[in-house]
Curated annotation (Swiss-Prot):
UniProt-annotated location(s): Virion
Subunit field text: Homotrimer. Interacts with hexon protein; this interaction tethers the hexons together.
Coiled coil regions in record: none
Species name: Ovine adenovirus D serotype 7 (isolate OAV287)
The protein's name in its UniProt record: Hexon-interlacing protein LH3
Stored Pfam families: Adeno_E1B_55K
Keyword annotations of the record: Virion
InterPro entries: Adeno_E1B_55kDa, Pectin_lyase_fold/virulence
Family membership noted in the UniProt record: Belongs to the atadenoviridae LH3 protein family.
């Protein structure tokens, strides 16, 4: 083709365009419309869930639900709908009827869970408030909660409670997943019992919660979360924790707590009280990371960024682990008004076992830290 023959109107076409043949009609089921099961706010949710394994909520709608008990798998796609709890709950309780619930899949996606009243900050958690939750999973495995919002829950927004029976089957199949979710204004974000293990709670955001992770069960990956204006990011004590369940302090705590951002836990934003009452009536003074269990070991602790986020290591098992290291973290605190803000504190009983390696920081208080156990040296040792 010469330049004289080249079309100005169609400069990139050298040959006539071959038209596509007209689409032929087909009775193939893949081309037919599919009726998705949409649950409307005025329908009975329990009856709907009993007859459907998948449910779609109506976009923009608000559902006023409480105490929906199910013993079957379900996938619920919220499409941005709101589910509101009024009074005691929880909204959902899943309880498997099987000893080994290997195929009990539950999925929540893109739902806004909210309680009608904000927690009373000056008050304490009590037995009557523990049911003010969004979802309880009791002996249920393989659950996923993705792209959901949880707001104003006066108890734990999510509770995972598994039995010990799975040990005999050697299945290790809890496999819970919480990802890309937001928790705002909750007393507790996520709680798990002593037999709820091998799960992931990562890439979530927590704002204005008193406790983000109320940790009993071990072997969870709690990484890459953003935690702002919350008094405590991670709490584990050996006895009398809330939401222990029947398994209590069974095989707890150990796992990973890495690459989290923890800002304004004890200064500059948090408005929750530091004092926290346990189930026996005793109280502790929360820190952004608080660990006190002489029978167990803390999680792997690496890459966390603390901006006024204090740490308190009260006790851990020195027979199960000879040394425990905090590595690659950043610690910033210490203002003129609060010179111990953001401090890293280790109890006298375990101070020789704690090492701080490769961390950065300003002149934040390092209380009871052995200078020879820290490289490079950061902060002000007291």
């Amino acid at each position: 083709m010469t330049s004289a023959e080249f079309s100005v109107e169609f400069p990139y076409v050298s040959k006539p365009i071959v038209p596509w043949p007209a689409s032929a009609s087909s009775n193939n089921s893949s081309s037919q419309n599919i009726d998705f099961p949409v649950l409307k706010p005025d329908q009975d949710p329990i009856a709907f869930f009993q007859t459907n394994n998948t449910a779609y909520l109506q976009p923009g709608a608000t559902y006023y639900w409480k105490c929906i008990e199910l013993s079957k798998p379900i996938h619920i796609y919220g499409q941005g709908a709101t589910v509101q709890l009024v009074g005691p709950g929880p909204v959902f309780v899943f309880n498997s009827e099987s000893v080994i619930p290997e195929d009990f899949y539950v999925v929540f996606e893109n739902i806004n869970f909210i309680e009608d009243e904000f927690p009373i900050r000056s008050g304490q958690l009590s037995l009557g408030l523990t049911t003010h939750s969004a979802v309880w999973f009791i002996n249920v495995w393989k659950t996923s909660i993705v792209n959901c919002n949880f707001k104003n829950f006066r108890g734990a927004a999510l509770w995972y409670s598994d039995n010990r029976n799975f040990w005999n089957a050697r299945k290790w199949n809890q496999q819970h997943l919480v990802s890309n979710c937001r928790f705002n204004g909750c007393r507790i974000g996520i709680s798990n019992t002593g037999s709820s293990e091998y799960s992931i709670a990562s890439q979530n955001q927590f704002y204005d919660c008193q406790i983000c992770f109320n940790v009993t069960g071990g072997n969870w990956s709690r990484n890459n979360n953003v935690i702002v204006n919350c008094r405590c990011a991670y709490l584990h004590v050996g006895d009398n924790m809330w939401y222990e369940g029947h398994s209590e302090n069974n095989n707890p705590a150990k796992g990973t707590f890495c690459n989290n951002i923890i800002n304004h836990a004890d200064n500059g934003g948090n408005v929750w009280p530091t004092q926290f009452k346990l189930t026996d009536g005793s109280t502790i003074q929360l820190a952004s990371f608080y660990f006190d269990d002489n029978q167990e070991i803390p999680p792997c602790y690496s890459g966390n960024f603390h901006w006024f986020g204090d740490v308190n290591i009260v006790n851990f098992s020195t027979t199960k682990i000879d040394k425990w290291c905090i590595t690659g973290c950043n610690f910033y605190g210490n203002t003129h008004a609060a010179n111990d803000a953001g401090q890293v504190q280790v109890a006298e009983a375990v101070k020789d076992k704690v090492f701080i390696i490769g961390c950065s920081g300003n002149n934040v208080t390092m209380k009871n830290i052995v200078e020879g156990n820290m490289t490079p040296k950061i902060g002000t040792i007291k």
